[in-house]
Amino acid sequence: MYYPEPIARLIESFSKLPGIGQKTATRLAFYTIGMEDQDVNEFAKNLLSAKRDLSFCSICGNLTESDPCAICTDPTRDRTTILVVEESKDVLAMEKIREYRGLYHVLHGTISPMNGISPDEINVKTLITRLMDSEVKEVIIATNATSDGEATAMYLARMIKPAGIKVTRLARGLAVGSDIEYADEITLSKAVENRLEI
């Protein structure tokens, strides 16, 4: 189907987002074009601001406006526990439940032998270094319940246990193959509460 070039480029841009197919990208493009100029400008400004003003915390790897992040510098946090997640959006999901008061570590992915992703390509080395220089007594592995998430959890457990640090995994209220960000708050709360030692 023919679209004027500006619309075609906008559709292409939207379709690059995860989970957005051609139909949804087309709907979003036409919706955006129909928005008030002020709303489009605000949307563009917010998008550029997020891209420009956010970076990764040098300690935990979470998205932040300042380095180190607010969680890492919060003196009320339990510094003896680190919860390891795949992505920054998982930190947001865990924070919503208000059940966990320790620190985080964001891997920015998982080990995936099928996709050629090794431990060196995710944020593992900084976790190991961080554990050696801290008072951490427990690492809770909260990777997703997928084959790559499981492989990553097992690898991390093998790397961390020799240091004498307790390694636990979220309990299974989470469906196999599901992502943490989509779990409801009660399920996540119970998964943290009933975590299992690996």
From Swiss-Prot:
Q: What molecular function terms (GO) are annotated for this protein?
A: DNA binding; zinc ion binding
- Start and end residues, zinc fingers (C4-type): 57-72
Q: Residues in domain Toprim? A: 80-175
> Is the keyword Zinc-finger assigned to this protein?
yes
The UniProt similarity line reads: Belongs to the RecR family.
Per the UniProt entry, what are the Gene Ontology biological process annotations, in alphabetical order? DNA recombination; DNA repair
Q: Which UniProt keywords apply?
A: DNA damage, DNA recombination, DNA repair, Metal-binding, Zinc, Zinc-finger
Q: Which gene encodes it?
A: recR
Listed name of the protein? Recombination protein RecR
Stored HAMAP family = RecR
Q: What does this protein do?
A: May play a role in DNA repair. It seems to be involved in an RecBC-independent recombinational process of DNA repair. It may act with RecF and RecO.
Where does the source fall among the domains of life?
Answer: Bacteria
Which PANTHER family does the entry link to? Answer: RECOMBINATION PROTEIN RECR (PTHR30446:SF0)
Task: Cite the source lineage.
Answer: Bacteria, Bacillati, Bacillota, Bacilli, Lactobacillales
